[in-house]
């Protein structure tokens, strides 16, 4: 080692073998110090720790050691991942919200059956963010508890600024999933309690329906605990309860809870029982048995009197409100049609003040509702029968705040009737647009439109764009003239030629127009007539062409005959008098006497008339 730099003067010191049998190298290898020598200098000779203390040296020297270490690390990593996965999978819970998202196609199909459309993002937002803030027990993961769903629906259908019309399709769909659950929802719906034997069935079991009916009543699903006794409402002098925030009033004595199906179908009490008195009076419904109706029928029936003459309240169903809104144009687009709908609802259903606000809030926008209420308050009349400006009379007849009217008294019902009349007047006045006669003139009869339908459109245009009432006898002449001038061309021409047109009423004109309209040819007859007229026109044109051709040939023949006759006669004359042709005359030769020096007109030999001969005119020569 003398050639190695830095090792000059070094000596080799042998280390003794270790006699301890329990000292081994890594993975059973013999100790590294056996037969190993340390190079030390002679200047600082001292003891160093053996190399076996430095295990990384084995990692660099042994491939098997590296393979074993990598296998151990990989096994530990796989074990940790397996334990973490097992722990998390064991904690995964299926919630109603995740269940509906997994079966979203079925949810959309259910919404389509309810005549609504739902979006997945808004579905998640309403379920996890909006509805838990209603404080009715709705969890963020959703629920199929019918009681909680009904409470949420009451909040959604609240009138005024507290309602949420944009959430109606979603809560209606969720309610349909709970009340008519598909197979994947049934395990999560609480089973209905069996009907006790002591409770007789009030109505026969209706057939199963694919479209569940909705109601604004809270679900009365009996709880597992003791059911508290229903509270009987005070006498009719007490204040009205809020149907959208309070429980519905009881109508019969507490008894065994009926089934959900019986409650949804609106069953009547047994014959021997009478409903408890209640101050809630509005639309009347009989408590007697009703025929089983299809599930798609309306739940808001006209008012009826009960067995004891007591008025009973039933609110509008959500399906009625939503169908009215979707199946009719907006108030701004067609105020007449929506006004007619609300008028029929006011007459047949006799809604309360709260119901009127709910109806207006559903069918009208905020601006339209304010305009209707303003026009209705303008229509309030005083004692003299003219519109009044007194605030107390206006607020008494058409209040903006909820009035304290007792619907079981005649005075309360009179207030309600007057309120409906004023509301209808407000709808009619608010639906009128500024006067625009051009709009009325632009209403014309369609090609296949009947005169009656055209007259209805014309009258609607008069109501909407003019301040005139088309039903007023004083406006009948204007409406009649518009009907004649704006009818279909064939009908208008025949109406204008009617005898004694001035004495005809609008009804007479409509009947005459109906006769003309009904005598119109069918499309097949019109096509056949056009075909026949085309053939006749073609035949006439062909005959005219033939006649013109014949006339042209005749004229050509006549001209040719004249030409030939002229040529033949000229040739004949040339042959007969060819030799007797007169000789050529000179320039100064007379054609009469053949002498030169003058012309025939100045010939002295030519006999003259009684005027005597003309003086001879001399021809001057150049030399003269």
From Swiss-Prot:
Glycans are attached at residues 113, 478. GO terms for molecular function: nucleic acid binding; zinc ion binding. Glycosylated by host. Cleaved by host near the middle of the molecule, releasing the c-terminal half containing capsid and nucleoprotein domains op GAG. Residues 1-63 are cytoplasmic. It is found in: Host cell membrane. Residues 87-624 are extracellular. The chain crosses the membrane at residues 64-86. It comes from the Viruses. Residues 520-552, 572-605 have a biased composition (Basic and acidic residues). Residues 200-284, 290-309, 520-624 are annotated as: Disordered. One of its GO terms (biological process) is virion assembly. It is a single-pass membrane protein. The keyword Transmembrane applies. Residues 200-209, 247-258 have a biased composition (Pro residues). Signal peptide: none annotated. InterPro entries: G_retro_matrix, G_retro_matrix_sf, Gag_p12, Gag_P30, Retrov_capsid_N, Retroviral_Gag-Pol_poly, Retrovr_matrix, Znf_CCHC. Keywords: Glycoprotein, Host cell membrane, Host membrane, Membrane, Transmembrane, Transmembrane helix. Disulfide bonds: none annotated. One of its GO terms (cellular component) is membrane. Plays a role in viral particle release. Presumably acts by facilitating the fission of the virion bud at the cell surface. May prevent the antiviral activity of murine APOBEC3. This is Glyco-Gag protein.
């Amino acid at each position: 080692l003398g050639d190695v730099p830095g090792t000059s003067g070094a000596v080799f010191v042998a280390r003794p073998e270790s006699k301890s049998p329990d000292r081994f190298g890594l993975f059973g290898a013999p100790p590294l110090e056996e037969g190993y020598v340390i190079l030390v200098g002679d200047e600082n000779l001292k003891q160093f720790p053996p190399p076996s203390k430095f295990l990384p040296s084995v990692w660099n020297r042994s491939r098997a050691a590296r393979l074993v270490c990598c296998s151990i690390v990989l096994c530990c990593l796989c074990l940790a991942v397996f334990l973490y996965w097992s722990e998390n999978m064991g904690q995964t819970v299926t919630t109603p919200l995740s269940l509906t998202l997994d079966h979203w196609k079925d949810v959309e199909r259910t919404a389509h059956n309810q005549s609504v459309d739902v979006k997945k993002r808004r579905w998640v937002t309403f379920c996890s963010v909006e509805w838990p803030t209603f404080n009715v027990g709705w969890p963020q993961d959703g629920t199929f508890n019918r009681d909680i769903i009904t409470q949420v629906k009451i909040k959604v259908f609240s009138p005024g600024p507290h309602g949420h019309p944009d959430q109606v399709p979603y809560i209606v769909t969720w309610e349909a999933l709970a009340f008519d659950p598909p197979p994947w929802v049934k395990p999560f719906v609480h089973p209905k309690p069996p009907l006790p034997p002591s409770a007789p069935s009030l109505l026969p079991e209706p057939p199963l329906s694919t479209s569940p009916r909705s109601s604004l009543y809270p679900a009365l699903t009996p709880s597992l605990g003791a059911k508290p006794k229903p509270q009987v409402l005070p006498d009719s002098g007490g204040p009205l309860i809020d149907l959208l925030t309070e429980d519905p009033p009881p109508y019969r004595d507490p008894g065994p809870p009926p089934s959900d199906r019986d409650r949804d179908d609106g069953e009547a009490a047994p014959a021997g029982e009478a409903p408890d008195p209640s101050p809630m009076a509005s639309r009347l419904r009989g408590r007697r048995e009703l025929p089983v109706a299809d599930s798609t029928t309306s739940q808001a029936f006209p008012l009826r009197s009960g067995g004891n003459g007591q008025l009973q309240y039933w609110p509008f169903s959500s399906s009625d409100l939503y169908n009215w809104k979707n199946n009719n144009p907006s108030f701004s687009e067609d105020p007449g049609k929506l006004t007619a709908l609300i008028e029929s609802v006011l007459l047949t259903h006799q809604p309360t003040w709260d119901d009127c606000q709910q109806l207006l809030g559903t069918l009208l926008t905020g601006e339209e509702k304010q305009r209707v209420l303003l026009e209705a308050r303008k229509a309030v009349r005083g004692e003299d029968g003219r519109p009044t400006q007194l605030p107390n009379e206006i607020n008494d007849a058409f209040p903006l705040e909820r009035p304290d009217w007792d619907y079981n008294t005649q005075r309360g019902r009179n207030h309600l009737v007057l309120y409906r009349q004023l509301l209808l007047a407000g709808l009619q006045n608010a639906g009128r647009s500024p006067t625009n006669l051009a709009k009325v003139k632009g209403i014309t009869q369609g090609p296949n439109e009947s005169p009656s339908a055209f007259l209805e459109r014309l009258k609607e245009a008069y109501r909407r764009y003019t301040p005139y009432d088309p039903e007023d006898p004083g406006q009948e002449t204007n409406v009649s003239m518009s009907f004649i001038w704006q009818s279909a061309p064939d009908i208008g021409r025949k109406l204008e030629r009617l005898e004694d047109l001035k004495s005809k009423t609008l009804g007479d004109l409509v009947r005459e127009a109906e006769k003309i309209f009904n005598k119109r040819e069918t499309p097949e007859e019109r096509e056949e007539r056009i075909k026949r007229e085309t053939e006749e026109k073609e035949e006439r044109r062909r005959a005219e062409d033939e006649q013109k051709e014949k006339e042209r040939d005749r004229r050509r023949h006549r001209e040719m005959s004249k030409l030939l006759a002229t040529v033949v006669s000229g040739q004949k004359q040339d042959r007969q008098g060819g030799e007797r042709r007169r000789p050529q005359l000179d320039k100064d030769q007379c054609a009469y006497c053949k002498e030169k020096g003058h012309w025939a007109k100045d010939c002295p030999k030519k006999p003259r008339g009684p005027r005597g001969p003309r003086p001879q005119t001399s021809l001057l020569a150049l030399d003269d």
